[in-house]
Swiss-Prot record:
Full protein name: Large ribosomal subunit protein uL24
HAMAP family per record: Ribosomal_uL24_B
One annotated GO biological process: translation
Keywords tagged on the record: Ribonucleoprotein, Ribosomal protein, RNA-binding, rRNA-binding
Gene: rplX
Pfam families, per database record: KOW (PF00467), ribosomal_L24 (PF17136)
Entry similarity comment: Belongs to the universal ribosomal protein uL24 family.
Function: One of two assembly initiator proteins, it binds directly to the 5'-end of the 23S rRNA, where it nucleates assembly of the 50S subunit. One of the proteins that surrounds the polypeptide exit tunnel on the outside of the subunit.
GO cellular component terms, A-Z: ribonucleoprotein complex; ribosome
CDD domains: KOW_RPL26
GO MF entries: rRNA binding; structural constituent of ribosome
Amino acid sequence: MAQNKLHVKKGDMVVVISGKDKGKKGRVLQAFPKEGKVIVEGVNVVTKHRKATRPQKPGGIIHQEAPIHSSKVMLYCENCGRGVRYGIKILENGEKVRYCKRCNETL
């Protein structure tokens, strides 16, 4: 059975490394560990045609982000200015933090 764990979390700044949105940066809005997918702000925007369900809720054309596979995104380091690999280290107080493998800054 596959492990249901992602390398990015909700709120992380990521960069897309492949596909039609390659190079775009955005925050992770939602993560789906069981599917291995994430929704990134401003990435993989699709057009939905919604039908009016009630008079209070009008229909129309709506643009929204669709999930992309988590393997297509990489954690973004503000210090390096690019997508980076990360490591995990334990601080003196016992707290686990992720750090950039390139510049050793805490992410």
